[in-house]
Amino acid sequence: MENVDTSRRGFLKSAVAASGAIMAAAAANAGIPASAVKSYEEEFDVVIIGSGFAGMACALKAGRAGLRVLMLEKMSVVGGNSAICGGNVACPCNPVQKAQGIKDSKELFIEDCLRDGLGINHTNLLATIADRCNDTIKMVVDCGCEFVPNHMLFEGGHSVPRSYEIKAGSGSGYIRPMHAELKKIKNVVIRTRAKFDDFIVSDDKSEV
């Protein structure tokens, strides 16, 4: 796996670069002017809205890097839709496939996704999934997630068996152990029943 700059400055720089376009688009149409805010009660390096797979993965990465993290969840329990999804995950060129002699490739995975997605997929993101899925599997297994051992599902839309089957039978098989891992990190704060209302932006809306 490639080296990642997890210093506070490096992490935040990467995060801003990755999300800047989305944040700017949202802030252009919404946002509370900074001049209207009288005081700040708390400060965090990273604020995560939602506690599904993406939110928890981000919180783990940032928390382990030593950043102060706040994760907000509007429901009374964490996980959102991620907790009730099927939970199986497609990962081309994984160790189980190789051990069972299943021939797969990044190109075949992308081809399958484009066909099933009617050609409107973002191929660069599909490539990222293919390149990083084995790192993702390792991360969740390290958190305590359990898959059916030595087994690949042959799911619809795929040319070969390439999907891991989560033992729990749903996304809760990820959410519960990831949540337990997050609770061990003292600089990560998780708040349920906490609805996100709006961004605070500079008066000219150039900064969030």
Where are these regions (language model features)?
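N-terminal secretory signal peptides and thylakoid transit peptides that target proteins
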Residues: 2-19
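Conserved N-terminal/central alpha/beta ligand/cofactor-binding core
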Residues: 14, 18, 68, 74-206
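Hydrophobic membrane-targeting alpha-helices
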Residues: 23-31
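A short, basic/flexible loop-to-alpha-helix module at the beginning of a structural domain
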Residues: 31-42
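Beta1/beta-strand and adjacent pyrophosphate-binding region of the FAD-binding site
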Residues: 40-52
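Residues that mark the start of a beta-strand
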Residues: 45, 67-68
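N-terminal Rossmann-fold NAD(P) dinucleotide-binding loop
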Residues: 55
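Aromatic pocket-lining residues of Rossmann-like dinucleotide-binding sites
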Residues: 62
